[in-house]
Amino acid sequence: MPTEETEPPVTAFMLVKTTPEWLALTVQERVDAFTTQVLPAIEARTSGVRSRFYDTEFYSARVTDVWVWEAEDHHAYQLLIDALRETPFWDRYFEVVDLLVGTENGYARTYGLEPVATITT
C-alpha cells in the first residue's frame, strides 16, 4: 500500500518594526487594537496556523519584534498573509521588514536523511 506524501509545514519568521503610531498608543490601546482589529481577521480567514511572538528591540536596531508563524501548508500561510494585509497591523502599526519562510529540515527531507542539523543538548 503506497504511503501518502504530505506537504511539510511552513514556518515564517516575520521581522517587524513598530511604527510611531503604534508606540503612541497606551498599552491598553495596543491590546485593544490587536484583539479587535487583528485577531478577528486572522481567526475568520485562516485555519491551521499558530504563532509565537518575540521582542527583539533590546538586541536589534533593525527590527523590534519577530513573529514566528507555523502553517500546516502554503495555502494556510497565504491566507494568513492576506488576512494580515487587510488589518492595520500591516504597514500602519508595524512595518514588515522581512519575511523568511522555509520548511524545517527541508534538505534532509528531500534526500531522505536524518535531520542532523537539528540539535538538542
UniProtKB/Swiss-Prot annotation:
Listed InterPro entries: Darcynin
Superkingdom of the source species: Bacteria
Family, as annotated: Belongs to the darcynin family.
Protein name: Darcynin homolog
Originating organism: Streptomyces avermitilis (strain ATCC 31267 / DSM 46492 / JCM 5070 / NBRC 14893 / NCIMB 12804 / NRRL 8165 / MA-4680)
